[in-house]
Amino acid sequence: MFLSGIDIGGTSIKFGIFDEQLNLLQQWSRPTPKEPAAAAALIAAQLEPYHVAAIGAGAPGTLNAAHETITADNLAWVDVPLAALLRRASGLPAVVINDGHAAMLAEMRSGALQNVQTGILLTLGTGIGGGIVINGQCWRSPTGLAPELGHIITHSDGLPC
């Protein structure tokens, strides 16, 4: 059985295939389609030869608390049911989380943030994102969302970004 890790970015979708011990076996990327359904179809088609057990994807922007609907400004996606699109296109279980949160979890498991009690991870790509570790746990807002470091209000009386 193989596992997948998908990073949906503003310009490309990065794919990783892992064994059950989470060793990276193969990686590649493809340009990100503009339409969400086309992105889901591309992901399903790219993973099909590997017979993966499920799809795990990180995507930029904000997800609702159930991780079913995403709004990503840099993709021009608003209220996109990405997890459902991935399940429909692939026939597999699919989970979508914020890409900064996904990067934080990966670094905490097997990267530079192993055994770290407090830390910040910053991701720079088409957008700005990241994650925060507090007391050895990934911090989420009271609504369950990952921090959106690229959406920080810079003026005290400014509009939410």
Regions found by a protein language model. Name each.
Residues 2-59:
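Conserved phosphate-binding loops in N-terminal lobes of ATP-dependent enzymes
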Residues 11, 100-101, 145:
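A generic "binding-loop/recognition-motif" signal
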Residues 7, 99, 125:
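Active-site glycine-centered loops adjacent to acidic/histidine catalytic or metal-binding residues
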Residues 19, 59, 65, 134-135:
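A cytosolic small-molecule/anion-sensing beta-strand core signal
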Residues 22, 73-75, 138:
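Glycine-rich, phosphate-binding/catalytic loops in enzymes
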Residues 11, 60-63, 125-127:
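Short glycine-rich anion-binding loops that position phosphate/pyrophosphate groups of nucleotides
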Residues 16-18, 26-29, 36-38, 95, ...:
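Glycine/GP-enriched mid-protein hinge/lid loop-to-helix segment characteristic of carbohydrate kinases
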Residues 31-44, 53-55, 63-118:
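Glycine-rich phosphate-binding loop and adjoining helix at the ATP-binding site
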